[in-house]
């Protein structure tokens, strides 16, 4: 089940996965897993550097195809809260490949897109399955953020299914 709701300043997606909490946690916190599902359809993640601890940094590169060819975007952030198998909170800002923050306007984002957003992931064991609630705070309601996350979580569900059926 997917419930995507947009408000003025947050996108929230709730999903239940047929997998244990520790596997979903690994998908969020281990670079090789994260890179396999993150981003909308067609996106690849050539770089996922993740120091998953409070105060640790993350540097993610997303490559997408556009009508004008391939485009590579970089995101930098910091982990604010890490509670194993329960809660993950990190910031996210557009950056260059060295992790220097860039203006959203310089990256072609619409007016009002914040320089720094916050991603909150809550995981709950529901009889061996995992209920996940992800809130991306700071994403404007009229952005494509909700659709992008929904596509990413479809990819996550496929990866989890493949992982649990091996």
Q: What positions do the PLM features span?
A:
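Hydrophobic ligand-binding cavity/cleft-lining segments
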Residues: 1-45
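Basic/polar N-terminal segments that are highly enriched at the extreme N-terminus
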Residues: 1-8, 158-166
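Short, charged/polar surface micro-motifs in flexible loops or helix N-caps
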Residues: 30-34, 55-57, 65-67, 81-88, ...
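Beta-strand/loop substructures that line and gate deep hydrophobic ligand-binding cavities in soluble
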Residues: 81, 86-150
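A generic structural micro-feature
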Residues: 5-7, 52, 69-73, 111-115, ...
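Short beta-edge strand/loop motif at the mouth of beta-sheet-based domains
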Residues: 12, 32-74, 166
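Intrinsic-disorder/low-complexity, polar/charged segments enriched in Ser/Thr/Lys/Arg/Asp/Glu/Gln
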Residues: 8-14, 21, 57, 74, ...
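Hydrophobic pocket/interface hotspot
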Residues: 24, 34, 58, 79, ...
């Amino acid at each position: 089940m997917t419930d995507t709701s947009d408000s003025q300043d947050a996108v929230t997606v709730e999903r239940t996965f047929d997998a244990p909490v520790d596997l979903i946690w690994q998908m969020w916190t281990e670079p090789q897993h994260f890179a396999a599902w993150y981003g909308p359809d067609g996106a690849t993640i050539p770089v996922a550097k993740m120091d998953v601890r409070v105060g640790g940094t993350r540097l993610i590169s997303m490559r997408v195809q556009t009508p004008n060819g391939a485009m590579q975007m970089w995101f930098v952030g910091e982990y604010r809260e890490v509670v194993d198998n329960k809660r993950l909170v990190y910031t996210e800002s557009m950056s260059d490949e060295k992790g220097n923050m860039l203006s959203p306007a310089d990256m072609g984002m619409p007016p009002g897109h914040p320089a720094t957003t916050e991603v909150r992931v809550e995981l709950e064991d529901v009889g061996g399955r995992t209920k996940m609630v992800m809130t991306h705070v700071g994403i404007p309601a009229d952005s494509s953020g909700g659709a992008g996350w929904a596509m990413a979580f479809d990819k996550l569900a496929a990866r989890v299914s493949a992982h649990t059926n091996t």
